[in-house]
């Protein structure tokens, strides 16, 4: 005999399955994509660049650039990936409620996220032949500072991310580093000049330091 708990679990699984299917159909309107297992869920990829994540019945879309500020305005929270001993917050935003209530407002955001992920992938593919000083906003002086802080190359810089690179540099130089370096590192990570960073994006970065 099936218990009430088992029935409720089955209903929840069916609802999750329907939600995922509706989201996949929604994304199809914007272009072709393929699915791969990621973070215990399903990652959505366009031209080998991941732009969305579906896991535990929740829908997440990749942030980056001006999209972050739009997600913040809409009250979307970042995805927290629970590891064995730590919780890592990654740049994917929970859009489950937004998809359920205002799917039309999500179309342009998902489209921009897809484009951002493709551009970043192209940028990262070209990193093998680049030096730190070749990144936007970086010069020889900053390259030396970053290397002294334990970030040896472009690959490591992009892997660690602007916020943690800034933390390392700030720690190495006694906590007396100009906050502009955070903007410069964020621009270098995104492939843009630091003056193009919008104020909401800067505030979001500051909150992570």
Swiss-Prot record:
Keyword check for Flavoprotein: no
Origin superkingdom: Bacteria
The protein's name in its UniProt record: DNA transformation protein TfoX1
Keyword annotations of the record: Competence
One GO-annotated biological process of the protein: establishment of competence for transformation
Annotated function: Required for DNA transformation jointly with TfoY (tfoX2).
Keyword ATP-binding: no
Family affiliation: Belongs to the Sxy/TfoX family.
Membrane-crossing residue ranges in chain numbering: none
Pfam families found in the cross-reference section: TfoX_C (PF04994), TfoX_N (PF04993)
Species of origin: Aliivibrio fischeri (strain ATCC 700601 / ES114) (Vibrio fischeri)
Gene3D superfamilies: 5' to 3' exonuclease, C-terminal subdomain, YgaC/TfoX-N like chaperone
Induction context: By chitin oligosaccharides, but not with polymeric chitin or chitin monomers.
Consequence of gene loss (knockout): Defective in DNA transformation.
């Amino acid at each position: 005999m099936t218990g009430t708990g088992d029935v409720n679990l089955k209903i929840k699984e069916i609802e999750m399955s329907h939600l995922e299917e509706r989201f996949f159909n929604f994304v199809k309107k914007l272009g072709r994509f393929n699915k791969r297992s990621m973070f215990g869920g399903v990652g959505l990829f366009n031209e080998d660049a991941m732009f969305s994540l579906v896991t535990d019945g929740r829908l997440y879309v990749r942030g980056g650039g001006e999209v972050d500020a739009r997600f913040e305005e809409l009250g979307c929270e970042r995805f927290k990936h629970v590891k064995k001993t730590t919780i890592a917050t990654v740049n994917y935003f929970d859009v489950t409620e937004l998809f359920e209530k205002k799917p039309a407002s999500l179309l342009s955001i998902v489209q921009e996220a897809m484009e951002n992920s493709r551009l970043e992938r192209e940028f990262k593919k070209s990193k093998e032949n680049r030096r730190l000083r070749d990144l936007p906003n970086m010069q020889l002086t900053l390259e030396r500072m970053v290397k002294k802080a334990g970030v040896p190359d472009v690959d490591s810089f992009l892997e660690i991310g602007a916020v943690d690179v800034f933390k390392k540099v700030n720690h190495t130089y006694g906590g007396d580093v100009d906050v502009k370096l955070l903007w410069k590192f964020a621009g270098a990570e995104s492939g843009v000049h630091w003056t193009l960073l919008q104020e909401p994006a800067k505030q979001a970065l500051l909150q992570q330091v």
